[in-house]
Amino acid sequence: MDAAWRGGVGCSPVCLDLCVGLSPVREPSAARHELLDRPAGCRGGGDSKSMTNDEAKIVEAKVTQMSEENRRLTEVIARLYGGQIPRLGLDGSASPPRPVSPLSGKKRSRESMETANSCDANSNRHQGGDADHAESFAADDGTCRRIKVSRVCRRIDPSDTSLVVKDGYQWRKYGQKVTRDNPSPRAYFRCAFAPSCPVKKKVQRSAEDSSLLVATYEGEHNHPHPSPRAGELPAAAGGAGGSLPCSISINSSGPTITLDLTKNGGAVQVVEAAHPPPPPDLKEVCREVASPEFRTALVEQMASALTSDPKFTGALAAAILQKLPEF
């Protein structure tokens, strides 16, 4: 304690009142009131021991009061904090925020700046090129409408793996792959006149019948059909009809000529009569082959050969199914 208090010299008391506005839990002792109500000159005249006891009681009362106030404040703060946790969506299981490295922060800022610049450039380009975009879209629409897709079925030997469909045009193979819905691979061809000719062809065996070869054509040729070389006219006709065997006889005032189309390779075999006539005129033969009568006879002969083929019905049904749209 202070020396002035020990010596009994009268002096002004030290005020230790730390009231913070909350009501005390209990009233201070009567000794404290009595000591505080005494005049300043009369406090130092008592016994030193009794004064020390009174001061100790006063300090104890103040400490008890402050402890109770602290306890009340702690309860109020805990109650307020507990009420704010549900509103802020915080809970004890939330993981602490991970530290962000400066490199990732720089990278994110750089990406955000690039995104902003690209958005500005796109907006300017969009404002300046609406007309061009509309024209190009219309042109693309027209191109899509002009694309023609057709399918052709050919019956082949199941052991043949060449995936070649002879249609009179020259093609260049540029790829082959296996599709998901068909175990047979699909071959991709371009017209030999590419890139000026945009026609493409896809050839693949039918998934239902391995003896059917399905060729899908995309686009139209912008060049005339290549003229067949000598001796390939019947081969082209046979390829258009599915390479079916047929024989045609032409009866005219001239010598009798038989065209045998049953030979493999499509070669024309001229069979002379029993009495060999004089050599025929080549121009006359070509004129007869190009005549409408020859074409009519060829069509009739091919039709009869198709109807007599037991597999023709199955091939025709498969071709019709290929043409029908998928529902």
Curated annotation (Swiss-Prot):
Question: Might you report a single GO cellular component term?
Answer: nucleus
Q: Where is the composition biased (Polar residues)?
A: 114-126
Location in or out of the cell? Nucleus
Gene Ontology molecular-function annotations: DNA-binding transcription factor activity; sequence-specific DNA binding
Entry's Gene Ontology BP terms: response to bacterium; response to chitin; response to fungus; response to salicylic acid
Q: Which UniProt keywords apply?
A: Coiled coil, DNA-binding, Nucleus, Transcription, Transcription regulation
Short sequence motif named Nuclear localization signal, residue ranges: 106-112
Induction, as annotated? Induced by biotic elicitors (e.g. fungal chitin oligosaccharide). Induced by pathogen infection (e.g. M.grisea and X.oryzae pv. oryzae (Xoo)). Accumulates after treatment with benzothiadiazole (BTH) and salicylic acid (SA).
Domain of life, per lineage? Eukaryota
Keyword Metal-binding assigned to the entry: answer is no
Q: Which residues form a coiled coil?
A: 56-76
Note the DNA-binding span(s) on this chain.
160-226
Which parts of this chain are annotated as the region Disordered? 87-135
Main localization is: nucleus
**Annotated Gene3D superfamilies:** WRKY domain
- Domains: what does the record tell us? The WRKY domain is required to bind DNA.
Function, as annotated, reads:
Transcription repressor. Interacts specifically with the W box (5'-(T)TGAC[CT]-3'), a frequently occurring elicitor-responsive cis-acting element. Regulates, probably indirectly, the activation of defense-related genes during defense response. Modulates plant innate immunity against X.oryzae pv. oryzae (Xoo).
Q: What is this protein called?
A: WRKY transcription factor WRKY76
Q: Which organism is it from?
A: Oryza sativa subsp. japonica (Rice)
Q: What is the lineage of its organism?
A: Eukaryota, Viridiplantae, Streptophyta, Embryophyta, Tracheophyta
Q: Which gene encodes it?
A: WRKY76
